[in-house]
């Protein structure tokens, strides 16, 4: 049965009633700050500003972000998203982001679509941010002495270069969720070097050249079950199998061998130019790679220990009677 006790609201239609309401304080303006802030900051800034037609309380302050932020007095902020594509807004970045940090923001997104080394390095130490998204060049934000983001779990990078100093960020995020994911459908060359962090290639569909050097896909300090190992290795191999110019290190070949022994099928590669940078080598690992590269035309071997001459002799025998061009790297 329907509840007939619901309160009905009738909008006055006569002129006197409208005049009376016009002179009274609007109901929205009488709401507590915390409630108003929750309502306003649930919208994008441009929509929040439009709500000023409903209330006089913040109407005169809705003409600028600085004034809008001045109305936010709650001690906690869940989300802060900043998108800037004009250089004349650069001087506001520091103020706005410091404001978000002062409110213990948990999820923050910075979308800065121009290059400048003037972006302030303001957040070296932070314990509240759990999710951080950057669309800017990391050269602009990496502090000289690294960071300490003790609560950060999710870190997203878009349209930005990764300088060598980026390791300072990763080392300052003790609970960052792994594996690292690379989504870069437009890049043609990818180089993964000197990392012990698990990495997943999500979209590298335009890739024609890749270097995978001295990486440990499955770090010994992390506990992976066999199924996870199989899936991760297989997915990375699938993303690299169409690359025409490929460079592998001996450690990566060893990872391939381990994965195959655990049941991961070794894919067929379309590589035409293969470079192997070897500190130590296992003949069976190398043979397996060559067997899976039927289109191979050029092989470059760079040996970094005293066994280089023996390795070169082995490859020289393979060259005899084949179309393979063998080059001894330095």
From Swiss-Prot:
Segment forming the signal sequence: none
Pfam families hit by this protein: F-box
Domain of life from the UniProt record: Eukaryota
Species of origin: Arabidopsis thaliana (Mouse-ear cress)
Limits of the F-box domain: 25-72
Protein known as: Putative F-box protein At1g57690
CDD domains: F-box_AtFBL13-like
Native organism taxonomy: Eukaryota, Viridiplantae, Streptophyta, Embryophyta, Tracheophyta
């Amino acid at each position: 049965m329907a509840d007939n006790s619901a309160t009905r609201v009738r909008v006055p239609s006569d002129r006197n009633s409208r005049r009376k309401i016009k002179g009274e304080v609007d109901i929205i303006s009488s709401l507590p700050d915390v409630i108003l802030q929750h309502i306003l900051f649930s919208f994008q800034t441009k929509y929040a500003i439009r709500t000023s037609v409903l209330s006089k309380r913040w109407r005169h302050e809705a003409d600028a972000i600085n004034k809008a932020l001045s109305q936010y007095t709650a001690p906690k902020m869940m989300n802060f998203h900043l998108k800037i594509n004009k250089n004349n807004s650069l001087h506001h970045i520091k103020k706005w982001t410091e404001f978000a940090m002062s409110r213990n923001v948990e999820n923050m997104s910075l979308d800065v679509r121009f290059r400048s080394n003037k972006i302030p390095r303001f957040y070296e130490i932070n314990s509240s941010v759990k999710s951080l998204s950057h669309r800017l060049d990391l050269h602009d934000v990496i502090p000289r002495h690294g960071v300490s983001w003790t609560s950060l779990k999710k870190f997203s990078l878009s349209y930005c270069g990764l300088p060598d100093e980026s390791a300072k960020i990763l080392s300052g995020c003790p609970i960052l969720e792994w594996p690292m994911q690379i989504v870069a459908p437009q890049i043609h060359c990818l180089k993964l070097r000197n990392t012990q962090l698990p990495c997943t290639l999500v979209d590298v569909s335009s890739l024609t050249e890749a270097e995978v050097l001295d990486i440990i896909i499955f770090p010994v300090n992390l506990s992976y079950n066999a199924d996870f190992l199989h899936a991760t290795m297989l997915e990375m191999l699938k993303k690299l199998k169409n690359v025409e110019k490929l460079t592998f290190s001996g450690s990566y070949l060893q990872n391939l061998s381990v994965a195959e022994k655990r049941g991961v099928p070794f894919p067929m590669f379309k590589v035409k130019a293969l470079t192997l940078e070897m500190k130590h080598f296992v003949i069976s690992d190398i043979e397996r790679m060559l067997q899976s590269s039927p289109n191979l035309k050029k092989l470059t071997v760079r040996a970094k220990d005293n066994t280089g001459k023996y390795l070169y002799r082995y490859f020289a025998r393979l060259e005899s009677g084949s179309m393979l061009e063998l080059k001894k790297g330095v």
